[in-house]
Amino acid sequence: MLIFSVLMYLGLLLAGASALPNGLSPRNNAFCAGFGLSCKWECWCTAHGTGNELRYATAAGCGDHLSKSYYDARAGHCLFSDDLRNQFYSHCSSLNNNMSCRSLSKRTIQDSATDTVDLGAELHRDDPPPTASDIGKRGKRPRPVMCQCVDTTNGGVRLDAVTRAACSIDSFIDGYYTEKDGFCRAKYSWDLFTSGQFYQACLRYSHAGTNCQPDPQYE
């Protein structure tokens, strides 16, 4: 009788596991459900031309920014409970990017409830030569600079949405975006333009270049 009860219990467990959507384990399914998700789609922003994944841009359009979505910091991808590909594509496209997606019907989502994405740390990786440093030099006194993100593959067309996003990084404590001319300015912390950090933000969001000029507002 005891053996029969054990076998029956195991059978119920197996039946319950097979009924879980998307092939998720009970623990992972409960984890996704905790975010209001059934984990059906996984999408991320990619750069034009290269197809490189852009974690910075992906994180900016996921989680708190998109209902019923969760940012998987391990993968750098956005998970959807519903088919939100059109909405997420609009986000990627607004930053001059493409989008890639795949179905999660056969993928087991790893638990990553404690994962966090350090967007600031990404800005310091592979820092390029400062693109605005020459502009920012004026004897011993630094010269105020303003910058904007531009599409270097399309004649330097300014990318307002990318500039706005790059201007909102935590490093720019007093940074602000001006709608009139599409530049990012900072009254005091504009040295981040000359150090290459703003360039990195444009790069992380959209593989964009920068256009930097002296800021006459603070001359």
From Swiss-Prot:
Q: Which interval of the chain is the signal sequence?
A: 1-19
| Record keywords, A-Z | Cleavage on pair of basic residues, Disulfide bond, Glycoprotein, Secreted, Signal, Toxin
Tell me the GO molecular function terms. toxin activity
One cellular component term (GO) for this entry is:
extracellular region
Q: What segment(s) does the record annotate as region Disordered?
A: 120-142
Q: Which SUPFAM superfamilies match?
A: Killer toxin KP6 alpha-subunit
Supply the residue numbers of the propeptide(s) excised during maturation: 20-27, 106-138
Transmembrane spans: none
Disulfide-bond pairs as recorded:
C32-C39, C43-C101, C45-C92, C62-C78
Q: Where in the cell is it found?
A: Secreted
Q: What mutagenesis or variant effect is reported for K180R? A: In strain: NK13
Asked if Oxidoreductase is a keyword of the record, the answer is no
Q: Which residues are glycosylated?
A: N98
Question: What additional remark is attached to this entry?
Answer: The KP6 toxin polypeptides interact with the cell independently, as monomers.
What does this chain do? Answer: This protein is lethal to sensitive cells of the same or related species. The KP6 alpha subunit is known to recognize some cellular receptors before interaction of the complex with KP6 beta, precipitating cell death.
Give the record's subunit note.
Heterodimer of two small polypeptides that are not covalently linked.
Write down what this protein is called: KP6 killer toxin
What organism is listed for this UniProt entry?
Ustilago maydis P6 virus
Q: What is the lineage of its organism?
A: Viruses, Riboviria, Orthornavirae, Duplornaviricota, Chrymotiviricetes
